[in-house]
Amino acid sequence: MIEDSQEDHNHLVSKLSDFSKQHKTLKVALVCDWLTVVGGAEQVLREIHQLFPKAPIYTSQYRPRKIDWFKGADVRTGWLNILPVFTRRFIAPLRQNYFKHLDLSAYDLVISVSGCDAKFVKTKQGTHFCYCHVPTQYYWGKTKEYQKDPGFGWLNIFVRPIYRLLLPKLRQKDLEAASRPDYYITISSYAKSEIEKYYKREAEVIFPPVNIEKFSEVAQYKDTIQGNCQIIQKHQNEKKQIEQKKYQETKNNKNQIDKKAYETIKIDKKQIKESLYHDINIESSQVENVENFAKVHDYFINFSRQVSWKRLDLAIKACILEKQKLVLIGDGPEHQKLIRLSEKHPDLITILPTLTQSEIKEYLKSAKAFIFPSEEPFGIAPVEALAAGCPVIAFNKGGAKDYILDEKNGVFFDHQSVNSLVAAIKKFNYLYYETENFEDGNNKKTVSQEHSSHSSLLSPLEISKTAEKFSTHHFKE
């Protein structure tokens, strides 16, 4: 049964306070599922390890060449480490057994960072805090997705029946593991509800650390860019209106357009162009003319691990339908499939391999929004995008609901479908450019028709501020 949440919260805060006062004299151990890739879980572990730098890290498999964050740390592995990394997805029962018999009862404080089996370790009563990302997804929340595509390529045909056969036993073992931690901490309101649903345990939400500072410097650049692009767009619209007026007046044998007004527009555009190149140090060779400047900064972006449940196929299909440019950055089992899906549209879809953080920041400078079509417990990448002043178009489920403010720092779409995402892209473009209608389902409408007062996106600097509560500083506090 789930205990009273306020009582649990107070007890957890009290215990954390007690441990924090004694941490210099405590014998502390850290545990994680594996250290073979760089991801959100590993980032959480890195921040916790900085708080307890002398604590050993227990894990099932470790590959320092794949993740170099823990060089010099006391990383301890067992017999599973002799197996190749690619076997990680095959050995769930072995990994459960490994952690089940890992005895850490000699430690005064054990912190497991787990979305899988690390929570199974043995500890003495009252010492085990589990920072649980979400109940093991391929046993619980995403069994349908894993059944459809277990992620083993041509071996899927053999894996599916084995998965169905083992699932009841794996679930039973996972529930046994879930009973071992004394206290649960988790990453989002969504993850909290999943832990309550499947494990019948109460969890305290502490948002995971995001390196906000590294990305927030992009927001200032984007603020200048977006402001100038919007000015350009405004003048383009004014020019179009004047040209339309000229056509109508000529057609009706009326006086020609007011040349003085037209010359004013041309002068303003020249001044804007000079201001752009002077203020943000952009070379004129980068764009043919001022009208094309906005087009350079006119693509959507996603950088993530490319796996089936991320639903990056939706982003590609929606952008092709809407004739919108999209840049996908990353690698994974779906990489080649995504390339094949987009190969007929090289003018719209660009797929790049995994890039460095500095390279990603350069792409964020020119992106108008991050597309986040997956249902995830949290989502580090979209928060990094927000920190860079880049709004997010997100599926209206999962951890995104903790940081997306609809029509302020992003736009939600309600169904994990191409049509729903297309409607969100149209809505976003309306808010971004403030120039066109959008369609939601079969109904064509405008934001002003939906709301009593006009709603528009925050500026890049304001968007960046909405990500500040997810900083590493806040996490450590």
Regions found by a protein language model. Give the residues of each.
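Active-site donor-binding segments of glycosyltransferases and PAPS-dependent sulfotransferases
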Residues: 51-119
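A charged, aromatic-enriched C-terminal amphipathic alpha-helix characteristic of glycosyltransferases
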Residues: 92-97, 416, 440, 444-447, ...
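Membrane-proximal helix-turn-helix segments that form the acceptor-binding/catalytic region
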Residues: 151-184
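Conserved donor-binding/catalytic core segment of Leloir-type glycosyltransferases
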Residues: 225-230, 292-310, 316-323, 327
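Nucleotide-activated donor-binding/catalytic signature segment of Leloir-type glycosyltransferases, i.e.
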Residues: 290, 336-358
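Acidic donor-binding loop of glycosyltransferase active sites
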Residues: 365-377, 390
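Short hydrophobic beta-strand element within catalytic cores of glycosyltransferases
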Residues: 391-395
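Conserved acidic donor-binding segment of nucleotide-sugar-dependent glycosyltransferases
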Residues: 406-407, 411-419, 425-433
